């Protein structure tokens, strides 16, 4: 690896920000299966896109059908899954995008690694704190039923641990908050951080 060198880009990050009209960031959704990560990530993505923001969603199931299809659900593979996604999110941020990442990401150390990969002021951790009981009651993919029946091993919350975030930027229980309420609160947070303005853009003077 010592013979590898990072090749600089002709287009600077600042130039991309000025063209896009907003700053890049990674919004990292973490929580149990069924807590609403993909639903809220996609709703937020649509909200931002309609306001002219350049966005993308990285979803756990989607990534495992391509980039990470060689990985299983052992602890080692889960760690590698999140590491790869963190690196992809970093590249997308370098390209100027607002990236919503929807991953169970059960281990605190892995989420911390992603935070360290990115610029601190461009990482927003959103913990969907919906209880195991509520998530299992929803069971949109039938995964909890399979895990309880012994048909699915290493399932988070059943026979594999989930470590709640120590200091998430935002936390919501989706059993008591609607999708629109959560999306609106996240958008307000992005506005407060200067990532976007209320109409979706950041002025040139705010970039730095």
UniProtKB/Swiss-Prot annotation:
Enzyme Commission (EC) number: 2.7.1.25
Binding locations of ATP: 31-38
Reaction catalysed by this enzyme: adenosine 5'-phosphosulfate + ATP = 3'-phosphoadenylyl sulfate + ADP + H(+)
UniProt keyword annotations, A-Z: ATP-binding, Kinase, Nucleotide-binding, Phosphoprotein, Transferase
Highest rank taxon of the organism: Bacteria
A biological process term (GO) from this entry: sulfate assimilation
InterPro entries: APS_kinase, P-loop_NTPase
Pathway(s) annotated for this protein in UniProt: Sulfur metabolism; hydrogen sulfide biosynthesis; sulfite from sulfate: step 2/3
Pfam families: APS_kinase
Active site: 105 (phosphoserine intermediate)
Gene Ontology MF annotations: adenylylsulfate kinase activity; ATP binding
Recorded family membership: Belongs to the APS kinase family.
Role this protein plays: Catalyzes the synthesis of activated sulfate.
Name recorded for this polypeptide: Adenylyl-sulfate kinase
Lineage, uppermost ranks: Bacteria, Pseudomonadati, Pseudomonadota, Gammaproteobacteria, Pseudomonadales
């Amino acid at each position: 690896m010592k013979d590898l060198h990072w090749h600089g880009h002709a287009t600077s990050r600042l130039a991309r920000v000025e063209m896009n009209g907003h700053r890049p960031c990674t919004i990292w959704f973490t929580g149990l299966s069924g807590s609403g990560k993909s639903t809220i990530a996609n709703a937020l993505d649509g909200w931002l896109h309609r306001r002219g923001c350049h966005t993308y969603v990285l979803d756990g199931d989607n990534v495992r059908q391509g980039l990470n299809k060689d990985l299983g659900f052992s602890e080692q593979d889960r760690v590698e899954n999140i590491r790869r996604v963190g690196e992809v999110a970093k590249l997308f941020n370098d390209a100027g995008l607002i990236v919503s990442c929807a991953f169970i990401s059960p281990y605190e150390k892995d989420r911390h690694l992603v935070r360290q990969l990115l610029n601190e002021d461009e990482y927003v951790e959103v913990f969907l704190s919906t209880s195991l009981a509520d998530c299992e009651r929803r069971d949109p993919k039938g995964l909890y039923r399979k895990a309880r029946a012994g048909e699915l091993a290493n399932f988070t919350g059943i026979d594999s641990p989930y470590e709640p975030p120590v200091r998430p930027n935002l936390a919501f229980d989706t059993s008591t908050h609607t999708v629109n309420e959560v999306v609106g609160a996240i958008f307000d947070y992005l506005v407060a951080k200067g990532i976007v303005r209320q109409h979706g853009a950041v002025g040139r003077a705010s970039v730095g």
